[in-house]
């Protein structure tokens, strides 16, 4: 358990509820696991997808994180795909990259038979394709 809604490095954003229930910044002090990665301010995560090694031989313990967000927020990591690679124990990020899309990404779907990732884009609406090329 990572602590939500008791502990978070983010901020509450929903009115009266935030006055009645404190949001603690420490996780460990309240019996929760400290997060490995924190996005503050929020990048508006919409999907987290494990990307298999077949996608790329170097992709061991890799995840794509899609984000929503608003126009003009690319610099804050919104409307992008965040690529994270974890160590063997999944307790440390050993690689991180951001792929700007400049569109709200509602969903990511890995299609094994075609070895590609579909992006379901919200605002346009459209479907994007993420495929590795040599």
Where are these regions (language model features)?
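Conserved blade-ending motifs and adjacent loop-strand segments that build the rim/top face
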Residues: 90-112
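Beta-propeller domain segments
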Residues: 1-94, 129-132
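A generic structural signal for well-ordered alpha-helical surface patches
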Residues: 79-82, 103-106, 115
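Blade-level signature of beta-propeller repeat domains, shared across WD40, Kelch, NHL, RCC1
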Residues: 107-134
């Amino acid at each position: 358990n990572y602590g939500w809604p008791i502990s978070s490095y983010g901020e509450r954003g929903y009115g009266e509820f935030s006055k009645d229930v404190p949001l603690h910044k420490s996780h460990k002090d309240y019996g929760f696991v400290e997060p490995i990665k924190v996005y503050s301010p929020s990048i508006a995560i919409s999907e987290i997808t494990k990307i298999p090694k077949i996608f790329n031989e170097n992709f061991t313990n890799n995840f794509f994180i899609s984000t929503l967000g608003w126009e003009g927020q690319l610099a804050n990591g919104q409307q992008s795909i965040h690529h994270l690679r974890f160590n063997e124990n999944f307790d440390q990020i050993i690689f991180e990259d951001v792929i700007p899309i400049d569109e709200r990404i509602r969903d990511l779907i890995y299609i094994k038979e075609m070895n590609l990732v579909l992006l379901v884009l919200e605002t346009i609406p459209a479907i994007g394709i993420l495929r590795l090329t040599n």
